[in-house]
């Protein structure tokens, strides 16, 4: 197939309108590379159709991703999750992949198959019509049975070895059928949490864990290596003890000039559990002062300050004022305490780098790298990737996960890393404290759509220190009696009149 002839591009590159960021990036890469080869512009077009239009039966097109063209759909029917193919179908060239990493691979495979001769007006580029390249990059995703029905979106690499299949326009029948398909494929259902409109299940099998979430007319299936944590099972979790449980909202050393050494904001929560162990949410910024505040509070509250055990440390998101203290604490205090578990859901660096509406995202990538480096310094540390619908049980405390970055796919729907915050509720002695991190308006909307009245809490941390991101709608569903405001007084005074903050203060 003659892609370039006489120095002019014969073929155009077509991507899926409304497709994934990875698909668009791959299409752009193909068009840009071909343009560089032939020193001419290559047309890049979406597959969108106007009312009454149909795709032409023939054309000189390089189809990238899950386009609406029949040739693309035929190629995808042959692919398992986590796989890719490059081939010709008639006169069209098809780059197909069930995965964001996989679609990137198709561009390399396609370009490697091209034969280029001549330069300038003599340039000729040929793709062999009988060529077929296939492969699988994720054996974990490939182990999943295919979902029948709904509107397939993509397979996403969501960080820490997890892969997520997203199918939109799903219904209860599609979800039920897929749960049966997982069982038939050799996965054993171990946990199911349901309410009037949502179904969350956890499976084990083949050395993998599979989480399914049917909510808001979308079916998400997440697979990763490993087994389910003991704290997901009430009868296997740490038992309650006789120590009086409490929660401490730790004051941080705030710098009103915000000069980078300390902060106007941050979040540090410590629960003492009934077995004498602790849970921590975030902890504060990347400085020795905040790390010492956390350690000193643990010592003050511990039944035995020489035997401090942290049952779980939650990191809401990879921003330095929340997660930075984990690095400093690891550096200074890991030999003085026992840390059993780290619970978080940090997207891939590629995802974080794709967030364009926040000048801090380069630091989010650095913070993520630092966290993962620090994880390796703790002996025997269990790392749990939190997913919506997860419940954990630790010494009389019940933790429910409401939103994570998982809820913001397809595509890069989050505008900042703030919206990737893990939002979770901790219930002790019948009282629930909702931890919101820096969740943005998009995450708030997803939480309300899925959870509604289940968000009701006795207390909550105000979103993003009172800065942008919160919505009055979200706060109306939480409807707390007590609000914890993790910010310096000067920031509180500057933001208290904002509509969502005024709602909390006046309701």
Segments from the language model and where they lie:
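Compositionally biased P/S/T/G-rich terminal and signal peptide-adjacent segments
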Residues: 1-12, 129-168, 222-231
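Solvent-exposed alpha-helical segments and adjacent loops
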Residues: 1-136
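Structural recognition of the beta-strand scaffold that forms the well-ordered cores
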Residues: 14, 61-64, 93-96, 270-272, ...
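Amphipathic alpha-helical segments
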Residues: 21-37, 169-191
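Core dinuclear metal-dependent hydrolase active-site scaffold
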Residues: 230-308, 385-456
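Active-site environment of divalent metal-dependent phosphoester hydrolases
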Residues: 265, 287-288, 318-324, 349-352, ...
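Active-site metal-binding motif and surrounding structural segment of the metallo-beta-lactamase
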Residues: 276, 288-347, 450-467, 479-484
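Binuclear metal-ion centers of metallo-dependent hydrolases, dominated by the metallo-beta-lactamase
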Residues: 341-343, 347-408, 414-418, 482, ...
């Amino acid at each position: 197939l003659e892609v370039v002839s006489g120095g002019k591009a014969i073929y155009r590159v077509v991507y899926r309108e409304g497709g994934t960021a990875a698909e668009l990036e791959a299409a752009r890469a193909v068009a840009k590379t071909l343009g560089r080869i032939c020193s001419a512009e290559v047309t890049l077009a979406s597959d969108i159709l106007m009312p009454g239009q149909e795709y032409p039966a023939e054309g000189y097109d390089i189809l990238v991703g899950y386009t609406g063209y029949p040739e693309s759909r035929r190629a995808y029917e042959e692919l398992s999750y986590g796989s890719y193919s490059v081939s010709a179908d008639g006169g069209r060239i098809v780059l197909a992949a069930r995965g964001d990493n996989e679609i990137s691979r198709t561009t390399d495979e396609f370009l490697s198959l091209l034969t280029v001769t001549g330069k300038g007006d003599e340039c000729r580029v040929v793709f062999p019509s009988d060529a077929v390249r296939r492969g699988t990059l994720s054996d974990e995703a490939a182990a999943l049975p295919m979902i029948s029905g709904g509107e397939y979106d993509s397979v996403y690499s969501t960080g820490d070895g997890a892969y997520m299949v997203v199918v939109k326009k799903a219904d209860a029948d599609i979800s039920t059928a897929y749960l049966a398909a997982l069982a038939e494929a050799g996965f054993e259902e171990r946990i199911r949490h349901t309410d009037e409109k949502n179904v969350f299940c956890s499976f084990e099998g083949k050395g993998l864990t599979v989480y399914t979430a049917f909510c808001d007319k979308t079916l998400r299936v997440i697979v990763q290596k490993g087994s389910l944590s003991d704290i997901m099972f009430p009868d296997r979790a740490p038992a309650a003890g006789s120590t009086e449980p409490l929660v401490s909202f730790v004051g941080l050393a705030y710098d009103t000039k915000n000069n980078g050494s300390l902060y106007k904001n941050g979040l540090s929560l410590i629960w003492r559990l009934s077995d004498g162990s602790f849970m921590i949410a975030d902890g504060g910024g990347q400085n020795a002062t905040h790390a010492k505040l956390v350690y000193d509070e643990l010592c003050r509250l511990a039944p035995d300050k020489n035997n401090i055990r942290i049952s779980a440390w939650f990191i809401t998101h990879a921003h330095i004022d929340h997660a930075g203290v984990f690095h400093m604490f690891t550096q200074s205090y890991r030999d003085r305490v026992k840390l059993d578990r780290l619970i978080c859901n940090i997207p891939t660096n590629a995802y974080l780098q794709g967030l364009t509406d926040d000048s801090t995202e380069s630091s989010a990538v650095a913070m993520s790298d630092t966290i993962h480096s620090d994880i390796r310094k703790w002996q025997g540390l269990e790392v749990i990737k939190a997913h919506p619908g997860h419940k954990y049980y630790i010494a009389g405390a019940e933790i429910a996960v409401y939103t994570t970055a998982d809820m913001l796919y397809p595509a890069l729907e989050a505008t900042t890393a703030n919206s990737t915050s893990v939002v979770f509720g901790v219930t002790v002695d019948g009282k629930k404290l909702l931890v919101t991190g820096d969740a943005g308006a998009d995450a708030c909307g997803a939480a309300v759509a899925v959870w509604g009245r289940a968000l009701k809490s006795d207390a909550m941390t105000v979103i993003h220190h009172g800065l942008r991101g919160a919505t009055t709608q979200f706060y109306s569903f939480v409807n707390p009696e007590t609000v914890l405001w993790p910010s310096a007084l000067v920031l509180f005074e500057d933001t208290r009149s904002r509509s969502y903050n005024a709602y909390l203060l006046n309701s």
